[in-house]
Amino acid sequence: MRQIAFYGKGGIGKSTTQQNTMAAMAEMGRRVMIVGCDPKADSTRLILHSKAQTSVIQLAAEKGSVEDLELDEVLVEGQWGIKCVESGGPEPGVGCAGRGVITSITYLEEAGAYENLDFVTYDVLGDVVCGGFAMPIRQGKAQEIYIVTSGEMMAMYAANNIARGVLKYAHSGGVRLGGLICNSRNTDREDELIIELARRLNTQMIHFIPRNNVVQHAELRRMTVIEYDPENSQANEYRQLAKKIDENDMKTIPTPISMDELEELLIEFGIMEQEDESIIGQKANATVA
């Protein structure tokens, strides 16, 4: 069994990418379980055709404790037999959402949820690299990390930060970076930029997912593209990504870069302009003058 985690900046399309890729993986005959590690509990909605799966934390609150739960209450089977679990989190502003991740994974292990599987995937809130959300990395639950990014500055900044988190636990926990997934935003020279970022991080761009409106059309129906329009070229992109992950033997210890290096890379590719130190702190009317 391989345990992999998808990390990435909020709003990058991480959950959508993960669900479509795992749908393709299940279509290939792999036995898959998705564990949502995001308080939004939206990591399984396209597989289950639901708004949000009832989370382990919600069910535990209703029952009194996690120990009172039955596995079939928290684990729901969706399309292609994909097993789905949402860890959930507390009400906004109260408590630590990362605790929900820790509680859920511990419960699933003790309840025998990991038996007879080929892949377990963790869909993790990515720009908050706190202890709870880093738990799949920190305790060696996820051995392979895939970072969903794009050619936008903040997505790349988050990817570099996540690489730092992987590096921190690479020697103690054995976690490795499996690659960057570029979920295209149609920015200039995007594929070249992410290939170069991957090179500097000592990894690969494992796949470039082109932008396609069919993804949004499928999401409106709470479906993966694999199910909604299986003959669409975008469905084949996710199938290619699933095959690449299934066959991936490039798992590395990342080499995160400094903020200065990241900015230099963005300037080199024309994403950022070279700063003119003389204009820093100047108001609009002063610059015009």
Curated annotation (Swiss-Prot):
Keyword Oxidoreductase set for record: yes
Cofactor note: Binds 1 [4Fe-4S] cluster per dimer.
Organism lineage string: Bacteria, Bacillati, Actinomycetota, Actinomycetes, Frankiales
Matching PANTHER family: LIGHT-INDEPENDENT PROTOCHLOROPHYLLIDE REDUCTASE IRON-SULFUR ATP-BINDING PROTEIN
Protein name (record): Nitrogenase iron protein
Top EC class of this enzyme: oxidoreductase
Its biological purpose: The key enzymatic reactions in nitrogen fixation are catalyzed by the nitrogenase complex, which has 2 components: the iron protein and the molybdenum-iron protein.
Post-translational modification: The reversible ADP-ribosylation of Arg-99 inactivates the nitrogenase reductase and regulates nitrogenase activity.
Modified residues (ADP-ribosylarginine): R99
Assigned keywords, A-Z: 4Fe-4S, ADP-ribosylation, ATP-binding, Iron, Iron-sulfur, Metal-binding, Nitrogen fixation, Nucleotide-binding, Oxidoreductase
Organism listed in the record: Parafrankia sp. (strain EAN1pec)
Catalytic activity: N2 + 8 reduced [2Fe-2S]-[ferredoxin] + 16 ATP + 16 H2O = H2 + 8 oxidized [2Fe-2S]-[ferredoxin] + 2 NH4(+) + 16 ADP + 16 phosphate + 6 H(+)
Pfam families (UniProt xref): Fer4_NifH
Entry binding sites for [4Fe-4S] cluster: C96, C130
Binding site for ATP: G8, K9, G10, G11, I12, G13, K14, S15
Enzyme Commission no: 1.18.6.1
